[in-house]
Amino acid sequence: LTLIDEIRIHGTANPFWTFGGGTVLMLRYGHRMSKDIDIFVPNPQHLGYVNPRISDAASDITTDYEEHAEFVKLVLPDGEIDFVVSRNLTTPGFDEWTLMDHPVKVETAAEIVAKKMWHRGDRPTARDLFDLSLVIEREPDSLMAAGEFLIRHRETFLRILDEHRDFLLPRFNDIRTLGYAPSFDYCAGLATEFLRQFPKSAADRRSRPRP
């Protein structure tokens, strides 16, 4: 929140941002351990206010970081904080929570999975599959409504699950599970069955996310 204040002070008085990623799914469903923080902002200019190379407030937090055009990753001893440029894909895509006495826009499970699949579905991680499987089970209707964002990289996603199984399996088994402990093959089968429900035409209609 200190860095959000930097955006508020030096950039936009009331910046729009959302809290998402695997840690939010952990807070919602207690499925696996996750310590990393994912903050999504629609304006790429906001990254400058959280970049230790530019911002004293950010450099006071850490000098270990990565910067790219679309995100800034802050590396801390207890985890990472990613500031990522992305608009919400679903509507509204968040719920209002109070965290540390502050109102926070916390992404819905469907929005989290939609972002994962839209932005990096062509390079899935074991945790991405794990999270997808959870949300398919817990919120199938919400995920169905977000289907157009799930199938942009569907063929590549499913091919990698099959062809890179030997690489992904040990990483999947290393996930620190909490209240959800399916097998890799179960999750891969569930993801395949779910994603195959959507016609290819849905992907063709959606060449880019809504502005």
Which residue stretches match the model-derived regions?
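Compositionally biased terminal segments of proteins
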Residues: L1-P211
